[in-house]
UniProtKB/Swiss-Prot annotation:
InterPro entries: FH_FOXA3 (IPR047366), Fork-head_N (IPR013638), Fork_head_dom (IPR001766), FOX_domain-containing (IPR050211), TF_fork_head_CS_1 (IPR018122), TF_fork_head_CS_2 (IPR030456), WH-like_DNA-bd_sf (IPR036388), WH_DNA-bd_sf (IPR036390). Residues 83-94 have a biased composition (Gly residues). Residues 52-73 have a biased composition (Pro residues). Residues 228-251 have a biased composition (Low complexity). Residues 118-212 bind DNA. This is Hepatocyte nuclear factor 3-gamma. The lineage of its organism: Eukaryota, Metazoa, Chordata, Craniata, Vertebrata. The gene is FOXA3. It comes from Bos taurus (Bovine).
Amino acid sequence: MLGSVKMEAHDLAEWSYYPEAGEVYSPVTPVPTMAPLNSYMTLNPLSSPYPPGGLPASPLPTGPLAPPAPTAPLGPTFPGLGASTGGGSSSGYGGPGPGLVHGKEMPKGYRRPLAHAKPPYSYISLITMAIQQAPGKMLTLSEIYQWIMDLFPYYRENQQRWQNSIRHSLSFNDCFVKVARSPDKPGKGSYWALHPSSGNMFENGCYLRRQKRFKLEEKVKKGGGGSSASRNSAGSASTATAPAATVASTPQPQPPPPEPEAQGGDEVGALDCGSPAAPSTPYFTGLELPGELKLDAPYNFNHPFSINNLMSEQSPAPPKLDVGFGGYGAEGGEPGVYYQGLYSRSLLNAS
């Protein structure tokens, strides 16, 4: 009896364990694991551009593809799939990821190199640099354009805009004067040169900023530039060896003789290069080019923003300082005897 009772008790224990078989089958069956897979597969057609009709049929034949997918941390690692995987998840979630990375790289590709940056010089400075670097100290308009484009690659674009500004600067500034072509140099367009009294616009060869704006009216009112700026005939070349303040003579006779201190101002007034209706022509003829446009002896000044530092590798040879204007100089006289130079020292470092 006791054995039968024990057996019954054992049987009861086993039967009491069998009703809990549902709990045993629940982890074995892949039904709970398929639920997140189905949810993951249903999310793909929402974000991917493919039609939703073909995607439900695609996971059915690809049965063996399910084992690599059931990674337990699918939920937490799901937002990182777009950034971590560049090729697999780029169809659905990789669109904004590479766009953000590409957006960060965009500014690097559009940075303008330093060689093509806009130079910190005004148009008057560019024209002055071009004329000063010319061997004859005068250039045509097309030669000024070409010099600027060769030295600064920035001006190789939008040529019509800045070339108009160059023309306006040449026309509306008294520091630039037109030089007529001589018969021995035929061609199109007149030459442009610097006014003899405009040598103090820039300081020590630095073209970043002008000291003051050059105007002929101010020179006439002040009446003292310390040097002569008049144009003499070829017969007065013999008296040009004296200082400029004593050898200056007026091109037109005047009834009252000018005072010594006001003599320079009257002579500057004779150079009315801006008024086309003035009796004195605004063009320098072949024999009347002033000698002040010639450079003096070079000095060892090396400004960091000087044009010579920019042109050190591009200029093949320094300009000849003793040539002046070549064929435009005085006849039968020494090259440096015609007039005394205005500049106490040259604006450019010819070394």
